[in-house]
Amino acid sequence: MKKIINHIIQKLGRKDYTIDSSLSELELVRLIYPKLIQAIRGAFLSIRIKKSKGVIFLGKRTKIKFKSKISLGKSVQIGDNVEIFALSKNGVKIGNNVSILKNTIIECTGVIRQLGEGLIIGNNVGIGQNCFIQVRGQVNIGNNVIFGPGVSIFSESHNYSNLKKYINEQGETRKGV
């Protein structure tokens, strides 16, 4: 069974991947079963996302808004409670072998008077639990990048130089990250 699972994982894009030999068959089944459920959920999502190239593993209670603005590569894992608000000028492009773990929020637009630019996530990227990516200016995440839990990225800051004006009246500065 381990040989088959190793082969499947390698076909999904994880070269030279080998399951730990100390895992029992029962433990392996307990790990694989939820992945099968996620793949079924992902299959339904891929019907609604027209720009999808491969298997999507979709967690529970995941919210993806503006699906027409998203393109997904091969073997993408989107964990439980992930929120992706993809409304932006250039959309959200997620590469191959990308994992976005639970409770992560990707927010591409805050107000509709000025849409966010867009987000590109490269290949072989891992985004840990509880991350926040605010896309106002263009955000580009390269290949082979790993974000630990709780990483936050902001591509916009409020101007605050005039002490006689409220901060929300002074505008914003956007800069790509």
Predicted segments with their positions:
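Long amphipathic N-terminal alpha/beta scaffold segment
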Residues: K51, F57-F66
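Short Pro/Gly-enriched beta-strand edge/turn motifs at strand-loop
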Residues: I56-F57, G79
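Terminal amphipathic alpha-helical/low-complexity segments used for targeting or macromolecular assembly
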Residues: M1-V55, N144, G150-V151, S155-G171
